[in-house]
Amino acid sequence: MATENPIRISGSNERWSNSRKVSVPNRSGSAPPNMEGSFLAVDNLLSRQGGSVYNNLMLPRYGFEEPVTTHPSSKHSLNRIPSPPIYYPTEYQFIDNRVGRFRSNQGLNKVNSPIHLSQGKLSTHKEVSEDESSQQLSVNSVSDRTDGLDIRLSPGSQSLADFRQDDTSSGQTPQHSRSNSSNGEVNTADESGNFSELSDDVVVKDNAASTARASIGNEKSPDESTIISKMKSTNISGPGTAKYPREPRYGQPERQPHQQQNNATWIQGGSNMGSHGVNDAVIGAGQFHYGQPYKFSGDGQPVLQSSGFTPPLLYTATQTAYMTSPAHVYNMQSPAVYSPQYGYGPYTNMIPQFMPGYPSHGSVPVVVSPDFIPQLSGPSAGSVVHGGEMQYAEKLYVPPGQPSFPDPMYMQYCQQSFGQMEPLAPRNHTNAPESQKDDPKFLRQIRGPSNSNMARPGMGVNYYGIQPNMGIMVQYLPTHLGPPLSPGHVPYVEAYPGWQPQGSLEGANGPRLCNFLEELKSGKGRRFDLSDITGHIVEFSADQHGSRFIQQKLENCKPEEKAAVFREILPHACKLMTDVFGNYVIQKFFEYGNSTQRKELADQLMGQIVPLSLQMYGCRVIQKALDVIEPDQRVRLARELDGQVMRCVRDQNGNHVIQKCIENIPADKVGFMLYAFRGQVSSLSMHPYGCRVIQRLLERCSHDHQCRFITEEILESVCVLSKDQYGNYVTQHVLEKGTSEERERIGRKLSGHIVQLSLHKFASNVIEKCLEYGGRVERDLIIKEIAGPDESYNSLLMMMKDQYGNYVVQKIFETCTADQRLTLFSRVRMHASALKKYTYGKHIVSRLEQPSIEENQELRR
């Protein structure tokens, strides 16, 4: 009777495929179905649904196991509850690192592994009770869930010690070795480009011994003690031997942060690991603290490598045996860090070990990382350094934000840089009190004797206080030093004690600039010179205290120092012109620089006059330049505004540049501006910024025949402008700076509306200016219109009670003649009792009751 063996037997040139098409054993039509086949079919359906998860994760699944049950053609009577399946281990059975258990009926993925199995007859099925069968099934299911290399035994299996004989004999080092055998070879290839580290060659020998071990027959089961003893020697775990430690798997990626085998709390007995494996030399690749996984272990518990602390090999084998239940996400909290990432500021959250597989925070020292030392960091070498700016005790300008929690599943895809650790620290970093930092005795007491073996250029030997590179672990990239010219930015430059020009600074974002800036803030910056910050003038110019320091030094410094500062400023002049603090340094150079320096700075403005004129700080630089540069250069700069005059006039910053051009450039040189104002004077006079420009034109160009049209347009609309909140200033300016003819024309224009305008909030100011700057004729017209023809006229009483008109009446008392004053007093005396009831009328009555000596004499007459 032709039947088909449940085990798929491949030839030497065939591959084990991961396809599910051949995963279910096929039976002949003559054999009736049994429960085992049903179970396998259901399991196949379930595994099909879960298979997409494995494919999406793109993780290599090395390993297979084939259940062998009673042969369907066997004449033995079939039992409804079949016996536990018989598993025949291969020489290497790999497991899924993420799931940590075998799944039945799953073949190798892209593995060329010829398996030679004998065609012997299956052993006779021995009927067992349901209790015994369930116990055996439970044992196998428990071993199914164990991590690492899992080999199941059956009564028909031979000694398992030979299964590793070929592999252990080929090499004794913990590395992959390539076999010299001409037999089959298994090339474990990547399924995804993201796992380039996994493309290692694994050699599996296949010889006649393996064929004999895989033969199916009625061989006598070896003694259990023999099996266990040989499994100990090969570190192969089987059912009932999970308590023995497994041999670590070399060459497969570890998926656990910070290489937790370094933590002594993971080893039973609490052995002190602090003195083992400390690398004080240059740390190589794969040993890092704030980095990404570089190596992955085959165990379920993921481990990242720690900062340069490698445990002895004697702990390596026993480490994973005492690990708690596996966690398939990354523990982002390193046991070598003093505060976790969700701690904030100086308040450390020491999280105890609540979750299984997560170590508690130990007091393992942290190797200094150059992620936070700019001259040693990875970005300078072109690599990606993952870390962040640390929270220095002295860098308290801007508190760092809370970093986002990373997704541990994606840590394996991050790139790590080579050799991130740096055992030494920057020199002279202190967190001591300010009063003791400069004390030599205190420094010697804290630092201790120097160590010549650790001396390196620009590096110190000891820390004291808080180590600068120790803090929370963050996932964002560190910032790089550039021209930090944004408002409120705090640049960081290195030390100030013993600075030397050009090259004495170790880095540009160290903590020692804080000390320097604090010295400047406290008023102790006079002991420093510009030569102390040579090479970092731009960074200091963008700081509030640094900018003030440079400005003070530029006023009295030597020409050589000023030239050195100018050479650094000139390439970054355009950026500093728009900086909140840097613009003052540029203005100071325009003011105290020589003619050559002024000309070179003015050349930097060419082509950027319009955008700088519209910028808050750039407009100040242009105004200063127009004050000090040569006349021909002023004209060249002003001509860039042609076509943009009205835009600048209506801008809150640009109008100042237009005013400065009007002040410093002759009218015949800026004819394009006057042409732009023609027909727009009235509207510009009522604009909040345009009214300033019109007033500046009246000051500088009112007597020029080219500017006559400005006055004419103002006089034509003087009544409207007098009532406008901005136009009234233009009208007042004409009364102050204009000619007598212009004042007379304004008086005639306003005649007939004096009382109405005197009660207006803005026009009342114009009437006061008419009384103050107008001639006798204009004043007489105003007084007659207010006083009226006789005493029955009530306009004066109404003005005295008004909040704006009473000021016009008081101005009349100040500017009128004696005869006019007597006439007004006689009118006021008639309404004195009524005026005392009003707030504004009281001022008029009090003035009436305290007349001058001349007035009293005239009143007595």
UniProtKB/Swiss-Prot annotation:
Keyword Plastid: yes
Pumilio repeat placement: 532-567, 568-603, 604-639, 640-675, 676-712, 713-748, 749-784, 791-826
UniProt GO BP: regulation of translation
Keywords in alphabetical order: Chloroplast, Cytoplasm, Phosphoprotein, Plastid, Repeat, RNA-binding, Transit peptide, Translation regulation
Ligase listed as a keyword: no
Gene3D superfamilies: Leucine-rich Repeat Variant
Domain PUM-HD: start-end pairs: 512-852
CDD domains on file: Pumilio
Superkingdom of origin: Eukaryota
Ranges where the record places region Disordered: 1-34, 105-199, 213-261, 426-454
PROSITE patterns, per database record: PUM, PUM_HD
Compartments, record wording: Plastid, Chloroplast; Cytoplasm
Biased composition (Polar residues): 10-31, 105-122, 134-143, 168-197, 224-238
GO cellular-component term (any): endoplasmic reticulum
Residue numbers bearing the Phosphoserine modification: S159
GO MF terms, alphabetically ordered: mRNA binding
Transmembrane segments: none
Main location per the UniProt record: plastid
InterPro entries reported for this sequence: ARM-like (IPR011989), ARM-type_fold (IPR016024), PUM-HD (IPR033133), Pumilio_RNA-bd (IPR033712), Pumilio_RNA-bd_rpt (IPR001313)
Note on domains (UniProt): The pumilio repeats mediate the association with RNA by packing together to form a right-handed superhelix that approximates a half donut. The number as well as the specific sequence of the repeats determine the specificity for target mRNAs.
Entries under PANTHER family matching the protein: PUMILIO HOMOLOG 6, CHLOROPLASTIC (PTHR12537:SF119), RNA BINDING PROTEIN PUMILIO-RELATED (PTHR12537)
Role, per record: Sequence-specific RNA-binding protein that regulates translation and mRNA stability by binding the 3'-UTR of target mRNAs. Binds the APUM-binding elements (APBEs) in the 3'-UTR mRNA sequence of CLV1, PNH, WUS and FAS2.
Protein name: Pumilio homolog 6, chloroplastic
Record organism: Arabidopsis thaliana
